Amino acid sequence: MINDDDLCQEMLHYLRKIGKSGMIDQIVSRKHLDLKKEKPQILQKIVRESLQEELNYIASLPTSIETDDFLCIHAGIENKNDWQNAPLSSFIEKRDFQKIGHCLKKYVIVGHLPTSNFYQSQIKNDVLMDFDKKIISIDGGTGVKFISQLNALIIENDGKNLTFKNHFVQPLPIYRIKQDKFVENKESHKVSWPNFEIEILEKREEFSFCKVIHTNQMLWIKNEFIYLKNKHFYCLDDYIDHFITVHENEDVKVIGLYGKFAYIIKNKEIGWIESGYLEKI
């Protein structure tokens, strides 16, 4: 994408749609480059020259790391014994690995797709372990998802057994709950990749009642998470309409304050409360 002149348009698409806050985006910002005005070929050349040292280092790295117990690879492998005999794209772009699986006797550790993509009704970015398929997914969505975390998978081997632990970093501000707020338990609805297009059925001051076009799911979406593009409405990113019960003196992480409501994380439970129940620590 950076080194191949024929892929200069792909790099432009990456910057506009995917690569927010990555090193390519940082160069564009530092050089004050305008994506709308710069020719793709010139843009690609500037980025390539600015990141030559980093690109050389990345090019020197192996595509996979293999031990007796594990294979570490970016996106996945083909479901065959000679998985090495496959296009590079299958290692770095494979989207169906968790579904199709592999035939190795060892664990395959992958990233690429954020783990939150695999949950239908909740936003959850933890390390995902499928012991039956021997697949461990560690991508917490950092740099891609609005709500994300940086995961670390810790593997301990005492010579007889493997032990898995995980740790994560999620630098969000902490607030304290001022008083109890009970919310009736209802079914939660989630908007997630790749189905972000919506139809607004009813708009109110804080939330709009919407239908997800490709799933026909109905839910209330905070107005700040709705945007218009080419005469179509979309949800900004992964979103959940869940409201959370909170108790006095509990500490919660705040994703954001939006009007009269706050998007919070309480013990890894993600959802909404009225912002009046919060005080900053």
PLM-predicted stretches and their roles:
Residues 1-62:
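Active-site neighborhood of divalent metal-dependent phosphoester bond hydrolases
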Residues 1, 72-73, 106-116, 137-141:
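Active-site neighborhood of phospho(di)ester-bond hydrolases with catalytic His/Asp-centered motifs
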Residues 65-71:
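Beta-strand-turn-beta hairpins that frame and shape the catalytic cleft
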Residues 172-193, 197, 204-206, 214-217, ...:
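Beta-loop motif signature
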Residues 191-221, 245-281:
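SH3/SH3-like beta-barrel superfamily modules
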Residues 131-180, 184:
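Binuclear metal-dependent phosphoesterase catalytic core
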Residues 76-100:
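Active-site-proximal segments of metal-dependent phosphoesterases and phosphodiesterases across multiple
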Residues 85-93, 120-132:
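Short, surface-exposed loop/helix-turn segments at secondary-structure junctions
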